[in-house]
Amino acid sequence: MVPESSSGPREGVRITSEIGPLETVLCHTPGPELGVVTPSNRESYLFNDLLDQDKAARQHGRMRAILERFAEVYEISDLLEEVFDVPEARRYLLEHRPDVTGEKSPDLAPEEWVRVFIEGEESSGGTLASLLNEAGYTLPPLPNLFFLRDPAVVIGDRVVVAAMQHEVRWTEEVILRALFSHHPLLSNGGILYDGADERRMNTSIEGGDVHVLREDVVAVGMSERTSAAGIDTLRRALFSRTDVTELLVVLMPRHRTSIHLDMIFTMVDRELACAYAPYFRGPKRLPTLHLRASEEGVREKADLFEALGDVGMDLSPIYCGGGGRTVQEREQWASGCNLFAVEPGTALAYDRNEHTLSAMEEAGFRAVDGVEFLTGDTEIGGDERAVITFEGSELVRGGGGPRCMTLPVRRGPVAW
């Protein structure tokens, strides 16, 4: 976390864009919970591969150090430990995970409760389970927690607690609900939707699919993780309780390479977005539905960029992987589209996607090595566009990039 000013850390949430100057962001450094993922269960835990905990933590630490040059950065585990000292928050957390908490004293130290909630609690099992060396969990660990984008979204000064598609991530919803309800740093105008408590059949919403593009414009991917029913629920809440008047729904393929909208599209400047070309031009382009608060019905557009033009956001694409299809596929798989903007025209990206970085340079960005940026060997000019790179060879094996690993809760305004 950056040093506090004399007035203390910023409190309260507000997100009105994907690119506004970052002020406060939440992260989770991957830890021992990664050790539960094995070749036989990796798909159940939603992983593409097995991660080395130490390497993943080091690479995540480099990303966090870069973020700290721009904003206050908070570890989710630190905030969770603090809310466990709030009686109402502790009661909520324990009531929502009774299988394991019923076996422990409610007076357990906050840091021990944090360990249980994040690293899980292994079941003692019975005679047969012990004999066969088969481990089970009364509370499953959360190896996906470092992809903190998914369990919650801030829209304006309101919060959406996700309704995660897969049960292995449901505890993440409970944690984020407790934090946004009880931590003063995250004070807000109310919960728009509470996926931890309001779960309904076929209703799912995940943060990787929700992009606050402007104060009045939200784009959502209808994907394998975010359902039509979830989007309908979100639409009603947005149009009745926020300043959002335009909702753009991208009809996504049900495919592992594009589980969320942010795997194929991220905004990096006022008029630029990094995008996966096959889904935005040619025969496989993804239709986008435009819903407006002021009218009934739905308008269908050829793709998201066309729909954005209708709401006065004329974005140009920077194509992930450049112009060659094979390289586009390889770099999209390696989270080449999954950038995270810290201010207009400055974004974080993995260093491995060289053709994507070249495409960004052609669009006016300078590729800046993250280590050189941190040591001061390379500086970024005030009006200069830059993409700051860091090594993500281990992190990417989990299936996400910088946007996936960050939950911004406060950004400054954008001068459009």
What are the roles of these predicted feature ranges?
Residues 2-416:
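The feature marks the mature, well-folded catalytic cores of soluble enzymes
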